[in-house]
Regions:
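Accessory nucleic acid-recognition modules appended to NTPase machines
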Residues: 1-83, 88-91
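Conserved N-terminal glycine/acidic-rich loop preference
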Residues: 84, 90-96, 133-141
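Active-site ExK catalytic segment of metal-dependent nucleases
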Residues: 94-104
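Domain-level recognition of nuclease-like catalytic cores that cleave nucleotide substrates
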Residues: 130-160
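Active-site-adjacent loop/helix micro-motif of nuclease/hydrolase catalytic cores
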Residues: 103-112, 134
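Short beta-alpha junction loops
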Residues: 76, 127-132
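Short, hydrophobic beta-strand segments that form beta-sheet elements in well-ordered domains
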Residues: 121-127
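Arginine/glycine-rich "motif VI" loop of SF2 helicases in the C-terminal RecA-like domain
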Residues: 62-65, 112-121
Length: 160
């Protein structure tokens, strides 16, 4: 993802599959729903796979057209690999989205991506943070469920 259009840098060897529904993903992967209900902190269940699936599913639902495509970024270097979960394109701008199942940590991949793409003004970190939006430099921290709120990710993208 060196710039727009993102299709120019797509590799057919690297894909990131998403199911149509979180429930279908759980079934195919053999995830027992009762195991999920036993946990107080659902965000850490199955190493964040459910959280990433949920956010991806919501982004696809928000795409609103047949031409909407989901992208992600990965860099594979011998000493340092990095990955951004989703790249969302709105009004000719790229918005990187990182999904974290627990605390946001150092966000190494996001910082690498932003350093390589200084023209990007806003990046999103979706995690189990409190409802209040938190802004740190170019990063906006939002809770998973913000997608359903009219002040959430969709309205944030629409404001650009």
């Amino acid at each position: 993802a060196s710039g727009l259009p993102l299709n120019a840098d797509v590799s057919s060897k690297i894909i990131k599959p998403l199911f149509l529904d979180v429930g279908l993903m759980q079934y195919v992967c053999g995830i027992n729903p009762y195991d999920i209900l036993k946990h107080n902190d659902l965000s850490n269940v199955y190493k964040g796979a459910l959280a990433e699936q949920f956010v991806g599913q919501e982004l696809i639902a928000a795409g609103g057209s047949e031409n909407f495509k989901m992208f992600y970024w990965s860099r594979a270097k011998k000493s340092s690999s990095a990955e951004i979960d989703y790249l969302y394109v709105k009004n000719g701008k790229i918005f990187p989205i990182e999904v974290k199942s627990g605390s946001a940590g150092k966000l190494k991949s996001m910082h690498i991506f932003l350093k390589e793409h200084p023209d990007i003004s806003t990046a999103y970190v979706m995690s189990p943070v409190s409802f209040k939006e938190q802004h740190v430099d170019k990063l906006r921290f939002l809770p998973f469920y913000t997608r359903f709120n009219n002040k959430g990710v969709k309205s944030s993208f629409d404001s650009y």
